[in-house]
Every structure is written in structure tokens, then in C-alpha cells.
């Protein structure tokens, strides 16, 4: 029996998550990319188009977007349809603001970890079950393919 895989990133927003991942190879913009009523990716050019992010750990290289990102994200949080954790190669301020505002307005912790290596798709895959600590930056793969 092999031990779980542990990946050390950088903690950007505190909180803990245990659950399933949705892993994308493309940057993501929440504004016009996520339906905040359903949590489904609606950007037709995105590799996760049609996938629900609701309650999942969402892994993508970096955000693509605007200052509207936190507004869409907060609407998804309010509707119970937001990703429950975010993991990036590089998290920019608008992504981190999503987690901080979710905590401030709705008392919902959305852990964020960045600092993944560029070849993260070799380490994390859609459907993997993980534990994420947003304070320490630790990602532990519990099960997967």
C-alpha cells in the first residue's frame, strides 16, 4: 500500500477542504466563465465547459479576467454553487479576493493554494480525492487514478 502523495504549495487563503478535484489545463475567468446559479462552467472555449465546480476543488493555472471576478464568485457562494477550494500555479489578487470576501460576507472558507509546478496535470487529475490546507499550502492526494 503506497502512502498518499503530498504536494507542498503556498497557502494564500486559510481553510480546509476534502473532496473531489476538477482540473483544468487552461486559465479561467469567472466573469462569463461560470454560471453562478448552477456552478457550471459556461465558457464554450474552456476545457471544463459543462462541468459543475460546485463543492469541488478547482485546479487551474491562473485566473483570466477582470475585477468582476469576485462579484460572480460571491454570487456562486451565495447560491451554494461555488468551488470549495482553489489551487493554482499562480493566484492573482482577484482570485484571492474571492476567498477573503466569501469569508467576510458569508462566513464561508475557500482555501486557496498556489505555487504548483507547471506540470501539475501529472500530479493532480479530475476526480482525484484530496485534502487541502489553505493556510500551510499542503495538498494531500487521498485517492485517484
Residue ranges and their predicted role:
Residues 142-145:
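Intein/HINT protein-splicing elements and their conserved insertion hotspots or analogous self-processing inserts
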Residues 3-14, 21-140:
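Feature captures the catalytic cores and cofactor-binding loops of soluble hydro-lyases/lyases
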Amino acid at each position: 500500500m503506497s502512502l498518499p502523495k503530498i504536494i507542498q504549495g503556498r497557502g494564500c487563503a486559510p481553510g480546509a477542504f476534502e473532496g473531489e478535484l476538477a482540473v483544468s489545463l487552461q486559465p479561467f475567468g469567472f466573469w462569463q466563465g461560470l454560471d453562478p446559479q448552477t456552478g457550471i462552467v459556461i465558457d464554450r472555449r474552456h476545457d471544463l465547459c459543462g462541468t459543475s465546480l460546485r463543492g469541488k476543488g478547482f485546479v487551474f493555472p491562473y485566473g483570466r479576467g477582470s475585477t468582476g471576478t469576485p462579484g460572480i464568485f460571491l454570487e456562486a457562494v451565495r447560491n451554494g454553487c461555488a468551488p470549495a477550494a482553489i489551487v493554482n500555479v499562480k493566484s492573482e489578487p482577484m482570485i484571492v479576493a474571492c476567498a477573503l470576501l466569501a469569508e467576510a460576507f458569508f462566513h464561508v472558507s475557500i482555501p486557496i493554494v498556489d505555487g504548483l509546478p507547471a506540470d501539475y496535470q501529472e500530479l493532480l487529475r479530475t476526480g482525484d480525492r484530496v485534502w487541502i490546507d489553505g493556510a500551510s499550502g499542503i495538498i494531500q492526494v487521498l485517492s485517484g487514478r
